[in-house]
Structures are given as C-alpha cells and as structure tokens.
Amino acid sequence: GKSWKPSQGCPSRDRLVLLTVPFHDFAGRPTTGELVVAKSAAAVLARIFTEIYDSAAFRIERMERVDKYGGSDSASMAANNTSAFNCRPVEGTTTLSAHAFGLAVDINPVQNPWVKGDEVDPEAGRPFDRVPKRQAAENRGQPGIILGGGAAVAAFKRNGWKWGGDWSSYKDYQHFFQTCH
C-alpha cells in the first residue's frame, strides 16, 4: 500500500499484519476498524482494543488504514483517523518513527493533538491542546478524549505500552507506542 515505502528503509511487509478490532464510534455504536501493526504486537493490541471496547467508556471516531489517505499522516490526522503503521520518519528528523515498525497507534488525533508550546498538530486539535480544556470538553460530553486516568491509557499501560501524553518537553496525546528496536 501507499504507507509502505521501501526506499525509506521500512521493515519487510511479512513483519506486518492487518488487525481488525472492535470499537464504539462517537455515536456509541459498536463497529470494527482496521490497523496494520507489527506481527509481534498484534496479540497485545487485539487485547488492548478489546479491553477498551469492553469498558464501553471510550469512543473512537474512525479507524482506517493510512493508505486510504494516500499514506499522508497529515490527511489521516485531519480526518481524525485512528491508525498504526505508516512508514515515515519522526517529524523533523530522518529517524524512522515507531509507526514505521507497526509499534505505535495514534487515536482520535483531533481530540488528542501533538502539542509543543503554541504548536498544535493537527490544527483542528487546538480546542484540546491543554489539560484544563481537555477535561472541560470531556465533562461537556465530547467523546474520544484521552486522559491520564481514562480507559485507553489504562488498557495500553496495563499491557506494557507507553503514552505520549506523559512526555514533558511536548505532549502527543494521541500516541501510544512500544520501543522500536
């Protein structure tokens, strides 16, 4: 697909697998989505998303392969798409992202943006760029916001994954990952 770029040093396709997982959409309807992930992480990710689904406490707007967005991380984030594999470097570097190995998942990027100072990505995530705003939006009933004490963070951490919302120099609220190498 369009998210696999051998010229960038992507891992072999045989190290990746298509995973179908359950989730509740923003209207609360049960549905399924697709994530391309590392074979080595597939079982634990299936368990994590099943735990989140079973809690019925967290909602995801959409979950489609990044190929649908031409392999563009920006287009996928702007569509508030939850995704995993995308062979790309860490923004602003030449180092491959954990996404390039199928070892990272971004969930509801609009409600859970990347934030460094006044920079917010995607831009539509600006109403959710600070913890007080995030908590207020959740209190108003906005679905899909990842908070430290919530079901999504608990499920990922319980299964050995880390959360970008815990970082101190910047926040990546959408980002859950395993160490790549």
Label each PLM-derived region with a short phrase.
Residues 89-181:
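Catalytic cores and adjacent binding grooves of peptidoglycan-active enzymes
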Residues 1-11:
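N-terminal low-complexity, Pro/Thr/Ser-rich intrinsically disordered segments
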